[in-house]
Amino acid sequence: MAGPARWKLLTALWTIYLVWGSTYFAIKISVRTLPAFFSAGTRFLLAGALLALILAVTGRSMRISRRELLSSALLGISLLGLGVGGVTLAETRIDSSTAAMIAGTVPLQVIALRTLARERVALATRLSVFVGLAGLALVVLPGGDGSRSAVGLALAVGASISWSLGSFFGHRLPLPRDGFVATTWEMLGAGAFLVVLGVAGGELGTIDPAGFSLESVAAWLYLAVFGSLIAFTAYAWLLRNAPISKVVTHQYVNPLVAIILGAALLDEQLSLATGLGAALIIGSVFVAVRKEGAKPSAPDVLPASPQSIREDAPFERDAPRRSAAR
């Protein structure tokens, strides 16, 4: 039986490259006039509601046990609430390309967690972690141009740590077998969490629809529909139809896309040190995913996101749920 047409594979692959790579740019545009937690929370509520509608139309039940609901909510809060929500807040203070570079270290952080847990990790993979974290230091340390920048960098690093912890512990939780159902509940749980955070942080009093720019609203819709639904669907399809070694290439391509968009459309500048840091991060992630993706039984390294159906994907066992919501 012939496999899927090459054009389908390339279309799906470039969809996750470009869409997930552009989410950092879209977040930067959205928070120009939309409150950070409000925009992220409502985005996930909308995406979760649309996914629930799709499940209903296709006859798939969203009924799950209480344990699965609690696990889905906790994972959603870790990956999307604190992870993506933290990045969204960070981008009110730092460039989108900087946020993308920091988020790009998540696969390396998960490998570090696996090493600490005494899982078998190849020497080259472990060395790539040290190289990548050195790159992260170059990205973060030159950014001390005031307290706002320092706060933004700290938020982005904290968000990446939350995402890494969720990625590492996620497959140990009792989650629904259907990755789409799990993703739906994760989005809804994270959305509710972020809206509550926004209310507690006083965002409700700052919301003025008349002040929302068309660009910010369009970016918000793009994140909900393209970032969380269309790219998610392409990713889930790739996990079933493409070699995992090809699918995981998005982990080093996405930061590259984010850096290019930030420079071309937002006039974001990279210093020599930051550029070197970006090269070290992307290069080390390239080495890590190539080494891990080549192993038929390797544990998952990450996300995704995002966010999403990893029963048949040993390298990204829970990626569909994680990566979809970026």
Language-model regions, residue ranges each:
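Hydrophobic/aromatic residues within transmembrane alpha-helices
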Residues: 30, 39, 43, 90, ...
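Transmembrane alpha-helical segments that form core, pore/gating elements
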Residues: 51, 109-112, 116, 146-205, ...
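Transmembrane alpha-helices of multi-pass small-molecule transport proteins
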Residues: 8-9, 33-82, 107-113, 162-166, ...
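Specific transmembrane alpha-helical segments of multi-pass solute transporters/efflux pumps
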Residues: 19, 23-26, 52-103, 138, ...
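Hydrophobic transmembrane alpha-helices of multi-pass small-molecule transport proteins
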Residues: 51, 75, 105, 121-142, ...
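C-terminal-most transmembrane helix of multi-pass membrane proteins
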Residues: 1-2, 43-44, 141, 216, ...
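Juxtamembrane helix-entry segments on the extracytoplasmic side of multipass membrane proteins
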Residues: 4-10, 33-37, 41, 64-70, ...
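Helix-helix packing/entry segments at the starts of transmembrane helices
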Residues: 40-42, 80, 99-105, 169-192, ...
